[in-house]
Amino acid sequence: MIKELDTVVLSRDLSEHSLKRGDIGAVVHSYKEGKAFEIEFITGQGDTVTVATLNSEDVRLMQGKEILHVRKLQAA
């Protein structure tokens, strides 16, 4: 179950925010017993890209054996 402060992985592209499936975010708030979340996505330097309200099917928990990947953020 996803909870506040968990690291999550985006399950689909969010082109309106220049985010792609696989991007990493942090849960900053949970709604409706975990059916929706406020997720903050940041750059490698810690600048906020966006805070998006997403449904539980839009994200998944990051797994322990996964590795991060870097890509350049494209303007929306």
Residue ranges and their predicted role:
Residues 2-65:
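Basic/aromatic-rich interaction segments and small domains that mediate binding to polyanionic partners
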